[in-house]
Amino acid sequence: MIKSFSMSGQRRDLNREKFKLDNLLSVLISPESNANKNLKCLRNAMDVRSELQQFHPCSEMKCLSKGRSDIVVIKRSKGPESVFAIHNMTENKINYQLNDNDLPKIIDNELNAQDLLTSTKYNWKNISLDPFQVIWLSAL
């Protein structure tokens, strides 16, 4: 790495790992590798996102977590069709209660929301997030 830095003079080359194609492919296709698991999660997220009109670039977007450093909550779209992207930004498990003007119109049972990424069901008033977890909630 230092050799490529000294040749190019570009700081970005200092810590850039050089991959061998065969090694990289074997890691990516190995079901137990973190790279494979991460790639599957990213593919799933992109597939889900491509199907949701709420994630259209022109769709309304609002940050509901202003002033917080532990969680980011982004509301996409308006009304009962809204999707709430909730990101735990910490290495700790946290609990969160979602409050938004559109919620009273759609809360009607205990498990009233679903994560579009995993199909896990939640209650708007008691959302538990693992460290660095991301969920995309919509009403059931």
Predicted regions and their residues:
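C-terminal beta-strand-rich structural cap/linker in extracellular carbohydrate-active enzymes
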Residues: 120-140
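A broadly conserved detector of short glycine/acidic/proline-rich loop/turn motifs that flank catalytic sites
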Residues: 25, 77-78, 90, 100-102, ...
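Short amphipathic beta-strand/extended segments with alternating polar/hydrophobic composition
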Residues: 74, 85-87, 122-128
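Hydrophobic, well-ordered secondary-structure elements that form the walls
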Residues: 45, 86-88, 113, 132, ...
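Low-complexity, intrinsically disordered short peptide segments enriched in small/polar/basic residues
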Residues: 68-69, 86, 103, 131
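Generic detection of short hydrophobic beta-strand segments and adjacent strand-loop junctions
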Residues: 19, 96-98, 122, 127
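Beta-strand-rich binding/interaction modules
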Residues: 93-117
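Loop/helix patches that line or flank the sugar-binding groove of alpha-linked glycan CAZymes
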Residues: 1-83, 89-95
